[in-house]
């Protein structure tokens, strides 16, 4: 263990850290940030929630963007609505949450991505949202999403709240005429993107994929190796991929690696030493999330940052990982942690400990976008994960797409709300039914 790393971990004493954790992590970001952006309650229309709906779209044939090497492995793809939503040609019917206020402002979010609720369904979410939110003001968002509420402390309940929370932030931005990140408190106006690979099968596919990403303008790349959720656990193949991607990307390209918790402790140590040797910048989900002792050992032995948090279902789950030094950086999925509101709490909690925070981005356009707004408002993040190949997350019922500038950054949206506008004509043509 290096002296630098050991001294830093020793500094994380629970007696010193716990007061800061409670003070900052449980703070509600919305109201104070809105005031800082110059938005006052009296300036806004009636934001009482009037109606909650689910827009169910017709199945569509999904295809990989032109020139993309390889296909995602396994039926259904990653994360339900993520990636190609299964191999090219698979048919999926996507679902959008719709929340409408008395003043007619609508907020939307996807219901197709990762949710931890044990009995997730459209009708279950509708029942929750109608009973808990109709008649309430969007301005009272913290009172409805805080984990101090006993009902939201139960496993998975934050998933139900997350979809509503994201819709409400969309509404707030539209009402104020500002992109959401401006209300949260803008820290930057663009974020550097890295191409986040599919679970490809061979070294050759990864080499082709890195070249494709570089030709699209990406300056960084993350490996989702064959030993991930696609099956075919073979850490030795992972190591060959890791070496080939470094050789292809060159010495200066930031590279990240995410086996999605598929490795054993022994395998993770061997892979981690190779990541150190080749100067990778992130080792995400090196072990299953619950193996906190193994993560402590791994983090102490390696220089590559260990990144955990994607599969944590509440704010409280992060605490032992931070205090015990089981992770160098934290990560979140807003769908699991209470929406944008919960994600910003995780980011602030990490900031208390001088830690970086990497939000997850994978899935549909809106899944990318809600995390993007958090990233634009966070001082302790430098990355925007973009599903590879570029264009995979695009949907025909949106007028806007994720684009890279000439330096490989994604510029902030300028439109109000989530900032990526629905094409109502296309959406209406794709509508299968409305559940309410």
What are these regions (language model features)?
Residues 129-131, 273, 279, 290-409:
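Shared catalytic-loop signature of beta/alpha-barrel
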Residues 156, 165-198:
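Glycine-rich, aromatic-flanked loop segments that form ligand/cofactor-binding clefts
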Residues 104, 177, 283, 321, ...:
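Conserved, mostly hydrophobic/aromatic
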Residues 42, 47-50, 54-57, 61, ...:
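Flexible C-terminal active-site loop/helix
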Residues 190-302:
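Metal-dependent enolase-superfamily TIM-barrel catalytic cores that perform enediolate-based chemistry
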Residues 25-84:
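C-terminal segment of N-terminal export signals and the immediately downstream linker at the start
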Residues 1-19:
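N-terminal secretory signal peptides and thylakoid transit peptides that target proteins
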Residues 46, 100-175:
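Metal- or metallocofactor-binding catalytic centers and their adjacent structured scaffolds
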């Amino acid at each position: 263990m290096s002296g630098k790393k050991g001294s830093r971990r020793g500094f994380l004493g629970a007696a010193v850290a716990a007061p800061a954790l409670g003070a900052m992590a449980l703070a509600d970001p919305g109201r104070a940030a809105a005031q800082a952006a110059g938005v006052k309650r009296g300036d806004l229309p009636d934001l009482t929630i009037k109606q909650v709906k689910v827009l169910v779209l017709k199945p569509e044939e999904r295809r990989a963007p032109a020139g993309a090497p390889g296909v995602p492995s396994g039926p259904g793809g990653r994360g339900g609505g993520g990636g190609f939503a299964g191999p090219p040609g698979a048919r999926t019917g996507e679902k959008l949450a719709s929340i409408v206020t008395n003043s007619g402002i609508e907020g939307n979010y996807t219901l197709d991505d990762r949710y931890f609720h044990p009995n997730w369904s459209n009708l279950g979410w509708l029942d929750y949202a109608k009973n808990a939110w109709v008649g309430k003001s969007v301005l009272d968002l913290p009172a409805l999403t805080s984990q101090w509420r006993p009902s939201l402390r139960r496993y998975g309940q934050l998933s139900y709240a997350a979809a509503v929370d994201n819709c409400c932030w969309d509404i707030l931005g539209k009402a104020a005429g500002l992109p959401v990140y401006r209300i949260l408190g803008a820290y930057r106006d663009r974020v550097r993107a890295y191409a986040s690979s599919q679970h490809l099968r061979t070294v050759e596919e990864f080499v082709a994929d890195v070249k494709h990403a570089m030709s699209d303008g990406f300056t960084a790349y993350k490996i989702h190796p064959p030993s991930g959720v696609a099956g075919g656990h073979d850490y030795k193949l992972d190591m060959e991929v890791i070496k080939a991607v470094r050789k292809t990307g060159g010495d200066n390209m930031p590279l990240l690696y995410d086996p999605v918790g598929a490795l054993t402790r022994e395998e993770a140590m061997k892979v981690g030493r190779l990541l150190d040797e080749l100067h990778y910048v992130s080792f995400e989900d090196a072990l299953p999330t619950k193996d906190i002792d193994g993560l402590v050992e791994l983090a102490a032995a390696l220089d590559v940052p260990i990144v955990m948090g994607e599969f944590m279902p509440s704010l409280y789950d992060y605490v032992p990982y931070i205090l015990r030094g089981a992770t160098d950086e934290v990560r979140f999925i807003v769908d699991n942690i209470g929406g944008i509101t919960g994600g910003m709490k995780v980011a602030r909690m990490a900031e208390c400990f001088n830690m970086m925070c990497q939000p997850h981005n994978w899935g549909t356009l809106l899944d990318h976008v809600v995390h993007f707004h958090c990233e634009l408002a966070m001082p302790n993040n430098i990355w925007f994960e973009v599903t590879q190949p570029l264009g995979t997350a695009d949907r025909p019922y949106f007028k806007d797409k994720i684009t890279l500038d000439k330096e490989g950054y994604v510029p902030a949206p300028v439109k109000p709300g989530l900032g990526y506008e629905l094409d109502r004509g296309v959406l209406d043509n794709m509508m299968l039914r409305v559940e309410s």
